[in-house]
């Protein structure tokens, strides 16, 4: 079992228990705002693989401005760093959402970041100067 940690610059500490899915990048406006960049780099994990060791998270729930579904962002109460998001898509969304989407840039260990993203989401919102990730599945919207 492999663990990945996030704690270096922040007032929180969490562990991710591997294995988990490959990263994806998202081009939608909410993800840009969460990441403070042209895309977000996301790492979906099962809730049981995410272990908050220190700190307290604050949640805020919003309506996705591009697609209309509800999503929650969990962030550090002290430093404001976004840690993960959860999207609620579809008729059974609240009951089925058990997949924190970790903001991959918060990890101390760059191991999960070394491989290119397996998929790109919301490519219809991709900025014109941002290139396609070679070999990544391309999705017009959230999967």
Language model region names:
Residues 2-5, 12-143:
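A short Gly-Trp-Pro
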């Amino acid at each position: 079992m492999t663990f990945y940690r996030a704690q270096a610059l922040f007032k929180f500490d969490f562990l991710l228990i591997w294995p988990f899915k490959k990263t994806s990048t998202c081009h939608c406006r909410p993800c840009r705002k969460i990441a403070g960049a042209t895309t977000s780099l996301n790492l979906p994990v099962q809730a049981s693989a995410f272990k908050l060791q220190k700190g307290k998270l604050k949640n805020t729930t919003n309506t996705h401005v591009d697609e209309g579904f509800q999503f929650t962002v969990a962030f550090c109460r002290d430093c404001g760093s976004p840690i993960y998001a959860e999207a609620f898509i579809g008729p059974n969304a609240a009951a089925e959402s058990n997949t924190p989407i970790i903001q991959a840039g918060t990890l101390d260990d760059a191991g999960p970041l070394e491989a290119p993203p397996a998929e790109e989401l919301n490519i219809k919102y991709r900025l014109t100067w941002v290139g396609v990730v070679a070999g990544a599945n391309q999705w017009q919207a959230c999967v």
